[in-house]
Regions:
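Conserved Class I S-adenosyl-L-methionine
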Residues: 147-209
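Short alpha-helix
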Residues: 127-142
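A short SAM/SAH-binding and catalytic strip from SAM-dependent methyltransferases
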Residues: 70-82
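Class I SAM-dependent methyltransferase SAM/SAH-binding core
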Residues: 4, 10-60
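A short glycine-rich, Lys/Arg-flanked "PGG" loop and its adjoining helix->strand segment in the class I
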Residues: 84-99
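Short, glycine-/aromatic-enriched active-site segment of Class I SAM-dependent methyltransferases
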Residues: 105-125
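A short acidic, Gly/Pro-enriched loop at the edge of an enzyme's catalytic core
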Residues: 59-70
Length: 209
């Protein structure tokens, strides 16, 4: 099985998918430093033959048509302004019957989010859309909805636990601070506030081609 991880970062989800399911995973990320770190970490855990990384733009992916069985994206689409173009690309690289699974932060019913947030330090880097807008763009791309789950309440529980851990001085060596080296506490607090106040919501969804 061939899996594509869009916005693969330092490669944690890609390595997990490969290790747990035995699939071959290709990660794509626009940040060169993330791709280099992902390659180094993947080599250290012995998964380089299963997991590879490509530095590139998800809106214009360097892959052939119908190249993947699964496309995966975990909390990266908030930084992509042209989501319609992204979904067109996802449809293109997926094989018929292929699966697009993602987790994303969406705009809530209340005014703009508090910043800094985990996905953006300021509004200029944030491109949130509502659930309705996201679903409409996905449908227009030709992808078919199979599951759409609002996970906001679960996110709130996790965020409260993270906030409490930070308040207690818990700073694990391999924690979020590795990839979020600045404003970690402020981003944690704002993430919780945004969900509690209805400024954002979190969703997990599965679509098929």
């Amino acid at each position: 099985m061939q899996v594509l991880d869009i916005g693969s970062g330092v490669g944690g989800p890609a390595r997990t998918l490969a290790a747990e399911f035995g699939c071959r995973v290709t990660g794509i990320d626009i940040t060169v430093e993330y791709c280099r770190a992902a390659e180094t970490l993947t080599d250290k855990v012995g998964l380089s033959t299963q997991v590879q990384f490509q530095c590139g733009n998800a809106l214009d992916m360097p892959f052939g048509d119908e190249a993947f069985d699964v496309v995966w994206s975990q909390n990266t689409m908030m930084n992509m302004e042209d989501k319609a173009r992204l979904f067109t690309e996802v449809h293109r690289v997926l094989r018929p019957g292929g699966v697009f699974a993602f987790e994303v932060v969406l705009a809530g019913q209340v005014a703009d989010p508090h910043y800094p947030a985990f996905w953006a330090s300021s509004p200029s880097l944030s491109f949130l859309v509502s659930s309705e807008e996201m679903r409409a763009m996905l449908a227009s791309s030709g992808l078919r909805e199979r599951m759409w789950e609002d996970t906001t309440q679960r996110s709130i529980v996790n965020q409260r636990n993270r906030k409490q851990a930070l308040a207690g001085g818990a700073t694990p060596v391999l924690g979020l601070g590795v990839i979020v080296p600045t404003e970690l506490e402020a981003k944690t607090v704002n993430g919780l506030r945004n969900n509690e106040e209805g400024r954002t919501c979190t969703v997990e969804a599965v679509y098929t081609r």
